[in-house]
């Protein structure tokens, strides 16, 4: 339904925004070296304010995910946005300094975010007619290809970004 799709998009946007905020919190010192002109936390808002904003984004993202689970009657698929939220938090806190692992986690999260609408679309169908199965197969293939493209392009982008930011990471 349109309402379920809206909540899926809203949950995704809120969780992604939370991921950016928590990453910027952990990157205050690195950003001061690599991108001082773009630094917001520590210059325009305090670390405490940023952390409170992060918590608000996460709570709203979780609430949207719970509404999504209720609307779709699909708790398993609704766990994916929550899993992505945890991955983004662990990345910012622990894995971002691990060259390959951190890059892989961000790319995996991006790939799943792109794949999420496909999973909801084909996961909610119960019609097993030949035409419906063919349509679902086409949607699944397109979603998987798009998700893989998002994963690979993000992974390569993260590797390049790490090479550019090496001065602030030392």
Q: Where in this protein do the model-derived segments appear?
A:
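Small-residue-rich segments of transmembrane alpha-helices in multi-pass membrane proteins
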Residues: 41-42, 104-121
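Multi-pass membrane catalytic core of lipid/isoprenoid biosynthesis enzymes
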Residues: 9-11, 28-81
């Amino acid at each position: 339904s349109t309402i379920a799709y809206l909540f899926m998009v809203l949950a995704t946007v809120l969780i992604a925004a939370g991921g950016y905020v928590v990453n910027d919190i952990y990157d205050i010192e690195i950003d001061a070296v690599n991108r001082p002109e773009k630094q917001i936390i520590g210059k325009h808002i305090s670390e405490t304010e940023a952390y409170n904003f992060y918590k608000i984004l996460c709570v709203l993202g979780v609430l949207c995910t719970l509404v999504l689970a209720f609307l779709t009657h699909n708790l398993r698929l609704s766990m994916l946005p929550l899993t992505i939220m945890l991955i983004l938090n662990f990345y910012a806190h622990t894995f971002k300094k691990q060259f390959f692992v951190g890059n892989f986690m961000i790319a995996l999260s991006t790939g799943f975010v792109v794949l999420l609408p496909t999973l909801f679309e084909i996961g909610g169908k119960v019609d097993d007619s030949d035409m419906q199965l063919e349509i679902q197969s086409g949607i699944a293939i397109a979603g998987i290809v798009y998700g893989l493209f998002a994963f690979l392009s993000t992974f390569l982008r993260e590797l390049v970004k790490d090479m550019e930011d090496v001065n602030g990471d030392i």
